[in-house]
């Protein structure tokens, strides 16, 4: 009976008996059952009320009788006693004995029970009441009074569900009549409207249901498939007298509303023509957030990480995070210049980190608001990743100390797919943050777009239903209802560690921004808004009428905050410069100097001792757990690794293993995430071993490398790029002493996460003075696999590099490291396992952090020539930005007729072609391993070595793609434009690659011919 399923759509009118008969009653999974009803050897036709259509009600009565025999009618008490004694159902029923003073009542009851139609009616009426209660629980929110303006229904539907009793004539839906309103009905165990009472008159049942579900709070929860959670919510919203606030709580709420409202009014007075995306119309957001934080702090949370869009951001910074007001006001001063490196960002995108005492709980709490772009909802997974990292570093495995709060706009919450992606990370083992509180500022409009044009679902919050998150809709002009809902939301998160949504149904008093005219597109709405009293005024009038505060106290509260703002404004006039670093959302204490500079500009050797290389190699080629049966094919792979270790060589997978394993020894936590990364898309990695005989028994050998090593997290992600890359970026924000890698299944698919790359990874430091060392591993290579499995689009990453192609960087002792410090990200395409090993280790050994983009190979993973010796990985070795020609051509450089620069896999095709043409002495091939920042110094050295050679850039990508457009101007700057730079590669194309194998091979043959035809460019200028 607890598992009834009722469609959420509006029911078509049915009679009560039809409704009852149409329901399928399932037995509860509870241990207590009334077996006599289920195992009968005698006919029971004499008692049709025991049939399946009524069994739900009978079982409800039985459970109530078990708990308290006096809670049911005497006839049921006798029936259950007899039935439990072994009587058949037909014989179990007896009329109750004389009750003396209640003889007439008893006679009436006996006659009713002896009359079979009346017994059926009694049962059907009780079942009808159960259905009525359930209807309110499921659909009561559809008629809740949620819109402060009284214009729209929050669910965009003015129809009232047929089973919600808004007038007495609708009782007929349940087969009830107005005369039944004063009849007393036993309450089922699935409701708490009775409080301590087990039965209520129908009139009172309806009144209490209306009060619980149809006032200023609408509760969506009946889609949740966990009975305990449903019961918990019912108790929170149905129990009588739940929404009681004492006078002190009301005064605190009023003071918070004063701060929220007067802050916006102060900004409007001082900077009336500035965009600030104010909170007018949803001022209750500030006390709402503070309530969630207060309640969570009381439950043990000491770190709250928040993400939000532009709407109300300055108010949140001022009154929730408690950013100094003068620093906020400085952002409005157009004359102040920022002293930090980078370009900065607008004030309503900036983040903040602050530790303070929570005055309600008297406990320390740290608040962080993550900086974000204008791309709505893009910060959602970033916040979740940062939250996960902070939980990881403090050992908070259940989310009891660190939590996330995400704020959303109604249009974006419904419209942006990243919301869905982020929700689906919420319960994944390696991505869960153990519950997020989502607060939707539902101002019922998206810029100029009506919600009826902006979503197909009744509410903007319907996406949350996919993860069984309860949704609490609340009228934002009822501050006490908002506070109650926020308390419940925080308590839900603390109790169940699951997501929850608070939908603040409000309005936007101004246009999209303060300069926008909303009357163009929403004239009727804004006529009503112009008449609408501010929530502060309404609530103040309420408290004054209740005697909680008087007019003088209210005005003093306003004056006190106005004075705070004026004094901060005066102090802001003394500021001479802006500091973006004051708005840092993720500080790294101790990593930089006090003024935020690297502690050195050198990078130590990235090599390892032979002993460490051998040890890691041995672990990588074994199973460090007893009685663990691995797949036969994997046994061959591990055996091959063992042979390589004996021969002191590594392939790509083993080089990666050694780089990561060595960092674990140094206390660096490593997290590798992405689709299929545990095994590797190309079945080369195998960092997680699976027992072939025991389901779900796994082993991660890399966590068995060293005593006291840092943990290694390798996790297959959901089939998402946008959400998962954002999550990993957020994880990398939390600490510089961790290596976070995200690998695309194929490099081609990274563009699904383009927003994270364009708005966070590439410009993050320039906008927010926030370094990040995330590593992107993007499998790339033209191998005849078609246009969607060939290219990681290197041209796009290179286009976004911030180095000047026409300017030679200033020479210095630390030229290479200085270049890395000045760049916005590092782009490499390694051609050897050893160089990949070094660049991964360098990422951590650098004294600062930059994103690293690695175009990783596919065919080279098993290429017999793509091997490196231990000698290339020993102490004193390092990452080679260029690998110069080392063959016969280097022995007679003046005789070399062509110098080919290339990068990545194409090198092996070039060397094979050169060998086949017997041109080793005529053509030198140099590999540019680090594309950005461009190695001007080493390229110059290589060019000067071959004075008689013409210069060719060769790539396997099409001419309008790949590296050519980036490399050519930098090569020309390197040689001071003394020679032309020729191109050998595929012709320009719209698609990254052909899908035809023959065409692929024809293109390959053509550009290899061009590369080695020494007369190919004669006559060209």
UniProtKB/Swiss-Prot annotation:
Its EC number is 1.2.4.2. Keywords: Calcium, Glycolysis, Isopeptide bond, Magnesium, Metal-binding, Mitochondrion, Nucleus, Oxidoreductase, Thiamine pyrophosphate, Transit peptide, Ubl conjugation. It catalyses: N(6)-[(R)-lipoyl]-L-lysyl-[protein] + 2-oxoglutarate + H(+) = N(6)-[(R)-S(8)-succinyldihydrolipoyl]-L-lysyl-[protein] + CO2. Thiamine diphosphate binds at residues 311, 410, 443, 445, 675. One of its GO terms (molecular function) is metal ion binding. Expressed in the brain. Mg(2+) binds at residues 410, 443, 445. SUPFAM superfamilies: Thiamin diphosphate-binding fold (THDP-binding). It comes from the Eukaryota. Its cofactor is thiamine diphosphate; Mg(2+). SMART domains: Transket_pyr. GO terms for cellular component: mitochondrion; nucleus; oxoglutarate dehydrogenase complex. There is a cross-link at residue 533 (Glycyl lysine isopeptide (Lys-Gly) (interchain with G-Cter in ubiquitin)). Transmembrane segments: none annotated. NCBIfam families: 2oxo_dh_E1, PRK09404.1, PRK12270.1. 2-oxoglutarate dehydrogenase (E1o) component of the 2-oxoglutarate dehydrogenase complex (OGDHC). Participates in the first step, rate limiting for the overall conversion of 2-oxoglutarate to succinyl-CoA and CO(2) catalyzed by the whole OGDHC. Catalyzes the irreversible decarboxylation of 2-oxoglutarate (alpha-ketoglutarate) via the thiamine diphosphate (ThDP) cofactor and subsequent transfer of the decarboxylated acyl intermediate on an oxidized dihydrolipoyl group that is covalently amidated to the E2 enzyme (dihydrolipoyllysine-residue succinyltransferase or DLST). Homodimer. The 2-oxoglutarate dehydrogenase complex is composed of OGDH (2-oxoglutarate dehydrogenase; E1), DLST (dihydrolipoamide succinyltransferase; E2) and DLD (dihydrolipoamide dehydrogenase; E3). It contains multiple copies of the three enzymatic components (E1, E2 and E3). In the nucleus, the 2-oxoglutarate dehydrogenase complex associates with kat2a. The mitochondrial 2-oxoglutarate and 2-oxoadipate dehydrogenase complexes (OGDHC and OADHC, respectively) share their E2 (DLST) and E3 (dihydrolipoyl dehydrogenase or DLD) components, but the E1 component is specific to each complex (E1o and E1a (DHTK1), respectively). This is 2-oxoglutarate dehydrogenase complex component E1. It comes from Xenopus laevis. The lineage of its organism: Eukaryota, Metazoa, Chordata, Craniata, Vertebrata. The gene is ogdh.
